[in-house]
Amino acid sequence: MVQGTLYIVSAPSGAGKSSLIQALLKTQPLYDTQVSISHTTRAKRPGENHGEHYFFVSEKEFCQMIDDDAFLEHAKVFENYYGTSRLAIEQVLATGVDVFLDIDWQGAQQIRAKMPTARSIFILPPSKTELDRRLRGRGQDSEEVIAKRMEQAVAEMAHYAEYDYLIVNDDFNLALSDLKTIIRAERLRLGRQKQRHDALISKLLAD
């Protein structure tokens, strides 16, 4: 079985990261590509299902998983814990399915340290002006919040050079095409192709 690839995707808020990942998943069958499902201690919201949106666990269970080094990365956000299970990711990758993980640069650093075979993608907006427009377009934040988000975005973008691939999301369809191209290129790497076509290669090279 050909091993799947873990893709780490990071971007500042407003760059279109989540929209690109969701659009990608709609074009890929589940046996090819999936999105990572995190563990969390926060309460389940209406319409959310365990194992579909999150793995909902108690704080005691989560802390035990930390002690057992069960997470590729974890963080505490607004009094709730969130983490990416190493076992859950490895089980999916072992079936040959590629996994996408939407995470910030700090989480990406943790994951690369524990899983160096992961591929990382950073998504940039085409300009600060466009990023500001997108943040304002949500129509739900005050000027103070928008200014804070812009400040955080600049800090986040400063880490772009730590990633393997860089996509500028100016034209959404072009950015989506770039994302698909990265996946296609990774699947054509020698190691994966050799595994996939081992029988064919053996026959072609036989005397």
Swiss-Prot record:
Pfam families: Guanylate_kin. It is found in: Cytoplasm. It catalyses: GMP + ATP = GDP + ADP. Essential for recycling GMP and indirectly, cGMP. Transmembrane segments: none annotated. PROSITE patterns: GUANYLATE_KINASE_1, GUANYLATE_KINASE_2. Its EC number is 2.7.4.8. This is Guanylate kinase. The keyword 4Fe-4S does not apply. One of its GO terms (cellular component) is cytosol. Keywords: ATP-binding, Cytoplasm, Kinase, Nucleotide-binding, Transferase. ATP binds at residues 11-18. GO terms for molecular function: ATP binding; guanylate kinase activity. Residues 4-184 form the Guanylate kinase-like domain. Belongs to the guanylate kinase family. It comes from Yersinia pestis. InterPro entries: GK/Ca_channel_bsu (IPR008145), Guanylate_kin-like_dom (IPR008144), Guanylate_kinase (IPR017665), Guanylate_kinase_CS (IPR020590), P-loop_NTPase (IPR027417). The gene is gmk. Its main location: cytoplasm.
